[in-house]
Amino acid sequence: EIIYADTLEEDVKRRDFTVNGMAMNRYKEVIDLVGGRRDIKHKVLRTIGNPAERFQEDALRLFRACRFIAKLDFLPDKALLEAMPKAFHRVSGLSLERVRNELDRLLLEPAVAKGLDVLVQSRLAECSCRVVENGEIKEVPILPELYHLVGLPQEKAFHEFDGWYHTLVVVSETEPDLTLRWGALLHDVAKGMPTIRQVINGRYTDRGHDNLGAEMAYDLLIRLGYNKKFASRVSWIVKNHMRFHFFVQNEEADEKKWMRKEIRSGEFRDSQSMREAWLQLAKVCAADVLGCGKPYSVTDGTLAFGECMADLSLEMPVHTKDLNYDKRVIEACGDNVAKGLKYLMQQVQNGVVNNTPDD
C-alpha cells in the first residue's frame, strides 16, 4: 500500500540522503529542510534522519550510498558508516538484478575509487543477495573476493601501494567503460591467495595470479549474472595483463607468435573483436603502470604496443571470412572449399603466406 505524504516536510523525511531531500518551488527557490546545502558545501554524504533506520527501510540504500559517494566525490558521514553493518542482514532480501545495477553504475562514476573503498572496507561487498532460479531462491555472494586485497603487502621494488589501494588507482585510471573498469578491478584479484603468494629471499611474489585471477574473474561475473561474452572478455584481460607487460619490456619477444596463439585459442570470432580486445588490454595495462606509482609518460610504450597488436590483428585472419583471396582460390578448391579456406587461413596465421590476393 502506498501512503502519500501530506506535507513537503513529511515527503523529504522519507528520502535517503540529504542531497536528495531538497525541493524547488514554482518560483525556482530551493527549499532545504534537511541540511542538503550544508552537506553539498562540505562534500559529505549524510542520511536524512537516523541512518540505521534509513538503511533498514531499504537495504539497496547501502549500495546507493557507495554510488553517490563515487558520483559526487563526497566523503561518508561517520554515523552513516557506523550504521551500514547494522543493515547487512537485509541485503539477503535484495535481488541480484538491483544490486548488479548499482554496482555497474558505481563503476562508471568519476570518483569510483571512493565508492569502491566504502563498498569493500565496510564489508558490504562480502554480503549476499538473491536470485530466483527454477522457482527456487538462490543465495549469491556479491564481491567477497576483494577484501583480502586490503592491506596486502606488495614488493616495494615494483609497487608503491598495497594490493587494494593499487587496485583502486588502476580502476580510477581507466575510462568509464564496464569492460575496462571490471578488468581493472579484477586484474590482481588472485594476488595474496594461498596458492599464489610466496616469499622468496624476503621478497613477495605472486606468480600465476594472472591465470588464477582470470578463472576467478570469469566465475565471479557469471555468478553476478553477466553474459558469457562479457565475462570471457574481462577474464581474457586479466589473464593476459602480465604477458602484455612482458612484451612491452622485451623488444625481442615474438609478438606475432603470441598473436597466432590467441587467434587459435578460439576466443575471438573475428578480427575486429580481437582488435578491440588488444586496445582494451593496453588501456588496463597502462592504468596498471600508473597504479604502481609511475608517471603518465611511462605508459606511452604500453599504449603504443597495444596499437601495434591491434593493427597486427587485422593482418591475421581469425575466421575464413577475414581472408583476402582471389576468386581463383575457390575454383582451385573445387568441392572442398571449406577445407581449402581453413588450410589457407592456417597458412596465413602461421606466417607461411601473406593475407593478400596476390599470395
Roles of regions detected by a PLM:
Residues 1-359:
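Catalytic cores of the polymerase beta-like nucleotidyltransferase superfamily
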